[in-house]
Amino acid sequence: MNITSITFNNFRCFGEYHLQFKPTVNLLFGVNGCGKTSILRGLKIAMSSFFSGFSDSNTRFIGISNDDFMSEVHDGVESLERQVIISYDFAEFQNMILSRTGKKNRTAISGIKPLRDYTHSLYHDLSTEDDGSIALPLFAAFSTEDIHSSRKLDRSIFCKYYQPRSFGYYECLQGDGFFDYWMHRLLILQEGQKSLSEIEVVQCAIGAALGDSGCNIIRNVSIRPLQKTVYFHFVDGREIDSRNLSDGYKRLVNIV
């Protein structure tokens, strides 16, 4: 689900703004106040259209909010609301359009019907005949506040041994403040000896991204329920628990 281009009309600080994306890594450069955060916000809205059809309690379609309307003041008088339009192309779906005419209206999704129909069908297949072979796209968003954010969530959600695959999308585009919750889940699974394949996936991902074949920083993860601690084994021999990881390493682990 690579996004190839996006155009904003009357979105936040942009009257009209168009961006093309390369298929690999894209970097945004700009001075303070030029709209980088607004662009990222718009991209989250566009990417979340996947969840307009692939929808359950673990997913969330963000939509265009009241704060996304352009606000202009002339001689102390605020201008009338202008329709917000976000048009974008995925590699597989072109000319997708989300719009909202006013703050009293909801986000119109008629312009993403092909995508919505596809994702609804994908969710149906996943719910009825999934044997683990159905490939799902990856969505994730992280900000500079990720590990420092404090969120009050129901921990019981992370304590359920068996979760549907959609649980991997839980707040995936609003994921700040989740590090401690995911560490807690690893401890719960290890203690109950349940869903051990989920732990194995995490360990393999850490090893592949941060281990010998990756960044060569962290080689392995050990989960010790009796100590209520998750330890990270560094390639230099150090063993550090999750609470004492430096901000930089904690961010790396959180992203993986």
Functional labels for PLM-detected ranges:
Residues M1-F178, K194-E198, A208-G214:
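P-loop NTPase switch/coupling surface
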Residues K44, N254-I255:
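Active-site-flanking alpha-helical
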Residues F167-N254:
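Extended helical coiled-coil dimerization/tether regions that scaffold
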